[in-house]
């Protein structure tokens, strides 16, 4: 995270660069060509609620709105890239199939509970026909990792590991000897069922070395990612998305909306095509996210 909050005082299309960040002031589609492969993407775009100029009027238009962005995220992502996708419940549900179709694997949904202060004075009990909404959601996705096989196809990680070991002609039980464990290799790393566990890079490197020395001769190194070079522990570990656990945090985050000095105000621009005259106290963004949420997401997944 940057050490300071950058206040946007005008609308000139001028980028702001620092040692730890580049803030592009303009259409993000113009920034993608120079975008380095991201470790983490945090998306807070269209919600389908007319929330800003360019937002859609309903969730129905969100797939078309996000399609060019999802294409760029998918094109430039690394195997270990994670994505936080902010939206309404129905907005996220609408875009979810698009993300899945582009190789993003759903992990979980985080709910921001803003509490009763978010709706205080804004609910007419005589006319409302649903529970008042005090939430937004942020879905966590990771890249669906597939790896190349000897015959030119691809397999998911779990299936690929089994296929590489079987390619050696060795019985699965000898993977335990290769890893120096009692039964963890066959019970976790090479199992075909739901008990599968991502093996540490050290164990994959050990299996690769063992199959090279004891398996059938092959011109393609066992467990090689590119089919030419032998796998190293660090290379394998780099394929896995980062997760930094914090005790006590769950997938429900309770916090009131921003009403302090962190809230961006005073642009005198209407934040959506709505009928009101903005003042110096009007929020610049109707759904501005708290910095502590941003810090939490970045720390957890990068």
List where the protein language model places each region:
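Core catalytic lobe of class I
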Residues: 1-4, 9-302
């Amino acid at each position: 995270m940057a050490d300071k909050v950058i206040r946007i005082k005008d609308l000139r299309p001028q980028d702001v660069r620092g040692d730890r960040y580049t803030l592009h002031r303009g259409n993000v589609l113009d920034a993608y060509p120079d975008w380095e492969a991201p470790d983490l993407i945090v998306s807070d775009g269209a919600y389908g609620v007319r929330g800003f100029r360019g937002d859609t009027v309903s969730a129905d238009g969100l797939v078309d709105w996000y399609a060019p962005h999802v294409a760029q995220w998918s094109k430039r992502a690394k195997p270990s890239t994670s994505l936080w996708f902010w939206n309404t419940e129905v907005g996220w549900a609408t875009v979810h199939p698009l993300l899945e179709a582009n190789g993003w694997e759903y992990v979980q949904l985080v709910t921001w509970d803003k509490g009763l202060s978010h709706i205080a004075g804004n609910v007419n009990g005589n006319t409302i026909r649903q529970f008042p909404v005090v939430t937004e959601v942020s879905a966590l996705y990771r890249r669906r990792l597939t790896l190349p096989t000897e015959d030119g196809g691809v397999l998911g990680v779990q299936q690929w590991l089994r296929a590489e070991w079987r390619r050696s002609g060795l019985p699965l039980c000898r993977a335990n000897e290769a890893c120096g464990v009692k039964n963890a290799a066959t019970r976790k790393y090479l199992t075909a069922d739901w008990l599968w566990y991502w093996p540490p890079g050290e164990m994959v490197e050990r299996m690769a070395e063992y199959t090279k020395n004891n398996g059938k001769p092959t011109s393609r190194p066992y467990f090689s990612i590119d089919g030419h070079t032998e796998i190293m522990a660090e290379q394998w570990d780099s394929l896995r998305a980062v997760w930094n656990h914090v005790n006590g945090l769950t997938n429900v985050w309770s916090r009131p909306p921003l009403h302090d000095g962190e809230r961006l105000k005073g642009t005198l621009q209407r934040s959506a095509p709505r009928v009101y005259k903005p003042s110096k106290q009007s929020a610049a963004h109707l759904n501005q996210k708290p910095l502590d949420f941003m810090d939490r997401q970045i720390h957890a997944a990068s």
